[in-house]
Each structure stands twice: as C-alpha cells, then as structure tokens.
C-alpha cells in the first residue's frame, strides 16, 4: 500500500481536517491545526506531503521519525501540529486495514469508560451559571472555567476580588453537585498566580490549569508547594522532550498534551507513559473537532493514568459548526452518565461526512484569537 495524496480542509469554527488517500482505496482522517494559525500549519502539512507521497502508511513509527528528525530544525507548535494530524490519519488507515479500533492495536482497553468534562465560557457569573445549567441538561457534571480575565504583572485587589467572586458564585449556585477546574490560560504572572491560588483554594477546584505560561514552567513546583490543589498544564508543550523537563522538575499533577498539537497519537502515548512513571495523571487537551477527540479517546483507553477527557460540545468558540456536525456516526459519541465509551469502529472510529467537509471548507473563516491590551496599552495574554 502506498500514500497517493494528502488533502487539507480548513473548516468552521476554527478547525482543519486532512485526508490521506492510498492506492488501495483506504482513506485516513486527521486534524492538524493551531487555533489562529491554520494556514501556517496547512503549509507545513504540504511540505511534509512531498516526502509522504509514495510511502507505505503502515510504517507509522518510521514516517513519524522522518517528519520529526529529517529536518535540522524540529519541534514547536507548527511542525508538531502538522505531524499530529498526519499521524492520526495514519493510525486511522492502519485500523481500517486491520479491521480494528486503534485502541485495540495499542494493546487493548485499560478501562470501560472515561469521564468527560466541558469547557464553559463567559465573563460574567450569570453567563457561566447559565452555561453550566445548559450542559448539565445533556449529561455533564464536570467543567472547566476561566480562572480570571487578563491581569497585570502586579494587579490590584479589585482584579483579584472579581476573579474570586465569579468562582464563589458558581460554587454557591451548585454546591458539590458539580466539579470544575479553573484555567488561568497563562494570563497571570507567578506573583499574581500565588495570590489567586491562595484565594481560590476555599472553593475546592478540581485543578488549576496553566497558572503561568509553559515558558515559566520553573514556577510549577513552587506554586504546587503552596497549595493542595492539583496543578495541570501541557497544552502548549509539543513533544516528550518538553514534558520530560517538567516531569523531572515536579509540580504538575496532571499533564494535558493536545493530540493535535503534540505529535499525535504516537507521541502522546509516549508522553502518557512518561507521566505514569512519575505518578502524574493524563487529561488530554481537546477544545477542537471530532477527529482530535477520537484520537484523544484512543489514548485515554490504553493509558492507565488518564483521568478525564475535555471535549468541545457546546463550547462558545463553535460558531458555524458544532462538534459532531461533520460526523455521520454521531451515536458512537453518545455519553452515558457523563462518560465516553470506547469507539468500536475500525481505525479512529469516526465516519466523516466528506461532502459536508468539502462544502463548508469553501468559505471557512480564518479564526484569530482577540488581541487584548492592559489599561496602560501594553499587550495582555489572551
């Protein structure tokens, strides 16, 4: 079997799919994207395509190593996202050829179901509460919320009180009927993260995510030492080599590699194994589309340390398309009691509505995250 073509489709709301075709008619789908840099990742995919045409798609490990190591410069969000989507599609092809789901090819199940959680947007407490109520009606009881808005390097007590008040109102509205993590998005400095974490402890969040940027990872063990709340991070780390450093340093209780950013299934399964050796949990980052989610689920179901899975159903970014709009077998993604079950169809287990993909790719938006500025005019972290 040989690879004959690779096609990319930029899609609403902020996704990109790729299709790998073979000379035997077997097709694989992947999802390579950096939100806000889809065109750049697309260019990287087509650079890699030049080598991949004519290659055997069954040699996933060798193709991964060529894509990563054959160039003198490597790593980073763009290249690793391009590799990720290609890797997903190669696993999809292998599963279809062997008539088995990917998790079966990776050694079989270690669990029967995985807890799902949903991201809830909104800047005001009432908006967040309404969003949680809506998602509870479709089966969710675990969520992730913004921990704060933009914050100065050293900010005032009013900014701290605003962030704390939002979380307080949510806990008061739902008590212990729900669980939630708080995502700081790396928006705050280490000094302000210390203040916020201390103030938020009383509301017992499930975890604190990206209290500081990955570039400031040396602060993770320092922040972890001051709190009992688990610290999570990893969506902006792109290979096992970056995760190696944070695991050695300690501090993180949960790793959150993104299967569409960190080298795909092949790389993230290795990251999961590294995390298990350090007694660190796995919770793959996934505010993206159905192919990325399927890839995450296959890794979850073969990784003992996987604890829950993010998904984007109903997320506020989804303007123009919802999570399953491009999927024919929607029923396979149904949750039971807030849990996903294993996907059982061959490959990734996602049947893509290709006609719809082609149609909506014709006028896909070029999504960009907003530009935020502080009161003094300096650029703020989004």
UniProtKB/Swiss-Prot annotation:
Binds 1 Mg(2+) ion per subunit. InterPro entries: DgoD-like, Enolase-like_C_sf, Enolase-like_N, Enolase_C-like, Galactonate_deHydtase, Mandel_Rmase/mucon_lact_enz_CS, Mandelate_racemase_C, Mandelate_racemase_N_dom. Its EC number is 4.2.1.6. Its cofactor is Mg(2+). Catalyzes the dehydration of D-galactonate to 2-keto-3-deoxy-D-galactonate. One of its GO terms (molecular function) is magnesium ion binding. Coiled coil: none annotated. Mg(2+) binds at residues 183, 209, 235. GO terms for biological process: amino acid catabolic process; D-galactonate catabolic process. Belongs to the mandelate racemase/muconate lactonizing enzyme family. GalD subfamily. Transmembrane segments: none annotated. It comes from Enterobacter sp. (strain 638). This is D-galactonate dehydratase. The gene is dgoD. The record marks 258 as: Increases basicity of active site His. The record marks 310 as: Transition state stabilizer.
